């Protein structure tokens, strides 16, 4: 009788310790930050976002500083683990030696998940920095979607989709919400409609044209990014992952007819017009990988 009682007490104690350990693991705030360049304050021209361009080094400095502002905001909110993914072009733009050492940096390419490399279900929130309006936006600074040389428009389940929505879908696959997005005013208006009104936005500039803007000076943009990142992370309960219902019907409208012709060589891809192809996938990660493959093939 005493042995059985002792056994039960021990079992309950072990169970309690296990629950306590699990709870302790969940108390840390883990944040993923994807950093693009076209939406950074002060950036308005292709020369600034192209490696080797005349103003590139200054623009990458501003990009790095906006990433650091988001890191500081995450730390202000109590983040215990932060991963930053360089998400522009070559994905070798952020100045590694200048990134806040509280974060870990993912740099270089190719990467399977591209702008979202490193995301998984262990993260609590996603932040987008330096993002831009989708291709074809009337008032978007350096607007494009994934490949300015190939993609004229992109739809997922009939919804207009830019890089913000595309990457939010990847985060949603892992049940992680996007909570704060920084970029130009047109981008901010777009994501409020597509991802929902709760997403916190930071307007870094307002387009005057595709290559001109009324912009915050970098130091002011960085202050706002830090403040808004912290504010968003302190109210995580209001956010939900972006998860349209599967299956995922993806429609790519290319710039040129030969690009659609190349893409339609892939089994399962239907050419629905001269420049447009369509395919369906039950899993969004596979849908995204197919998208990348088709864009690569289109550019061949």
Model-found features: residue ranges?
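Active-site glycine-rich loop that binds ribose-phosphate moieties when present
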Residues: 148-174, 183-187
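A glycine-rich helix N-cap at a beta->alpha junction
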Residues: 101-119
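Bacterial N-terminal signal peptides that target proteins for export
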Residues: 1-9
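C-terminal segment of classical bacterial N-terminal signal peptides
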Residues: 14-22
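C-terminal accessory domains and tails appended to enzymatic cores
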Residues: 218-300
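Active-site rim beta-loop-alpha module in soluble metabolic enzymes
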Residues: 170-178, 182-233
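Mature N-terminal segment immediately following signal peptide/propeptide cleavage
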Residues: 25-46
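Alpha/propeptide regions of enzymes that mature by internal proteolysis
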Residues: 54-86, 91-92, 102-104, 228-235
């Amino acid at each position: 009788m005493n042995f059985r009682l002792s056994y039960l007490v021990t079992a309950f104690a072990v169970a309690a310790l296990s629950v306590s350990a699990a709870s302790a693991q969940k108390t840390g705030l883990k944040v993923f930050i994807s950093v693009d360049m076209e939406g950074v304050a002060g950036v308005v021209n292709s020369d600034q976002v192209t490696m080797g361009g005349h103003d590139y080094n200054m623009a990458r400095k501003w990009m790095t500083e906006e990433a650091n502002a988001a890191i500081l905001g995450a730390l202000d909110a109590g983040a215990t683990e932060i991963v930053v993914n360089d998400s522009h072009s070559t994905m070798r733009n952020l100045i590694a030696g200048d990134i806040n050492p509280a974060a870990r940096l993912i740099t270089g390419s190719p990467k399977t998940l591209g702008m979202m490399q490193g995301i998984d279900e262990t993260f609590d929130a996603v932040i987008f920095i330096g993002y831009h309006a989708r291709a074809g936006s009337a008032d978007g600074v350096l607007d494009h979607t994934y490949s300015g040389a190939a993609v004229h428009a992109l739809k997922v389940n009939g919804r207009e989709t830019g890089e913000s929505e595309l990457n939010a879908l990847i985060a949603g696959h892992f049940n992680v919400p996007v909570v704060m997005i920084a970029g130009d005013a047109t981008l901010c208006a777009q994501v409020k409609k597509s991802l929902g009104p709760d997403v916190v936005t930071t307007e870094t500039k307002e387009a005057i044209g595709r290559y001109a803007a009324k912009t915050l000076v970098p130091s002011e943009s960085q202050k706002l990014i830090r403040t808004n990142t912290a504010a968003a992370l302190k109210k995580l309960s209001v956010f939900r992952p972006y998860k349209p219902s599967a299956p995922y019907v993806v429609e790519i409208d290319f710039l040129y007819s030969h690009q659609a012709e190349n893409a339609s060589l892939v089994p399962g891809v239907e050419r629905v017009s001269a420049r447009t192809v369509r395919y369906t996938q039950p899993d969004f990660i596979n849908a995204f990988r197919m998208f990348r493959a088709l864009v690569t093939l289109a550019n061949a």
